[in-house]
Regions:
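Active-site loop/oxyanion-hole signature of alpha/beta-hydrolase fold enzymes
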Residues: 5-39, 54, 77-82
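Short beta-to-alpha linker loops that shape the active-site pocket of alpha/beta-hydrolase fold enzymes
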Residues: 10-14, 68, 182
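Short, amphipathic alpha-helical "lid/cap" segments that border enzyme active or binding sites
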Residues: 24-28, 190-198
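Gly/Ala-rich beta-loop-alpha elbow adjacent to hydrolase catalytic centers
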Residues: 41-46, 50
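Flexible "cap/lid" loop of the alpha/beta hydrolase fold
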Residues: 55-103, 131-138, 160, 165
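Conserved alpha/beta-hydrolase catalytic His-Asp/Glu region
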Residues: 96-145
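Conserved serine/cysteine hydrolase catalytic core
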Residues: 128-191, 195
Length: 202
């Protein structure tokens, strides 16, 4: 993204006890010294804790990329099993770990990548040891009162695109921006994604 400083996050994926607060702390630490003009992008699971970050420090905009959105007072598990959001995830791939099974990784994450790109991406995958962020009641007391955007990946095989569109409207009050890609456009369509993200910084 030309003209923009990019801050990459090193999340504590290997910590079996890490929940939203622990993940948010890692983001807050990475953003030390970044100033106030921050557009924070949360991909996939990261959407569940980027609002917590925005409640702790100055953030200009939140962007959810094929991401979960937290709901105050409940957990993702309860929403899926006992609420009206059973379509949040693709049920065919629940309890399958793409970091341990190359075929699963290609099927649900990198199906729209060139083979050599998919294999490179698989080599970079890290196992997410904790499921706390999905099982815990969201620690967010209130959603931050800042501008938000949602990018729905129309060929997503992990987070259901229909759920993304509906929930972006219901919880964020925005119409999702459609990106023709699978769950990981930063791998399969980086130029297109960069264009969309750049437009959202204006």
């Amino acid at each position: 993204m030309r003209g923009h400083q990019i801050v990459a996050m090193d999340l504590p994926l290997e910590d079996p006890d890490a929940g939203a607060v622990r993940y948010a702390e890692a983001v807050l630490q990475a953003l030390q010294g970044a100033g106030d003009d921050v557009v924070l992008v949360g991909h996939s699971m990261s959407g569940l804790f980027i609002p917590f970050v925005a409640n702790q420090r100055a953030v200009r905009k939140l962007v959810y990329l094929a991401a979960g959105i937290p709901k105050v007072g409940t957990s993702v598990v309860d929403r899926v099993l006992h609420g009206n959001e059973s379509d949040m995830f693709n049920p065919a791939h629940l309890n399958k770990d793409p970091s341990k099974d190359e075929a699963v990784a290609i099927e649900i994450l990198f199906h729209d990548c060139k083979p050599e790109v998919a294999h490179w991406a698989i080599s970079k995958l890290r196992h997410q040891a904790s499921r706390v962020v999905f099982a815990e009641i969201s620690p967010i007391q209130a959603m931050p009162d800042i501008e938000s955007a949602y990018i729905v990946c129309t060929e997503d095989r992990t987070v259901d695109p229909a759920w993304s569109k509906r929930t972006a409207r219901e919880l964020l009050g925005v119409e999702a921006i459609a990106l023709p890609s699978g769950h990981c456009p930063q791998i399969s369509r980086p130029v297109h994604l960069a264009e969309v993200l750049t437009s959202l910084t204006k």
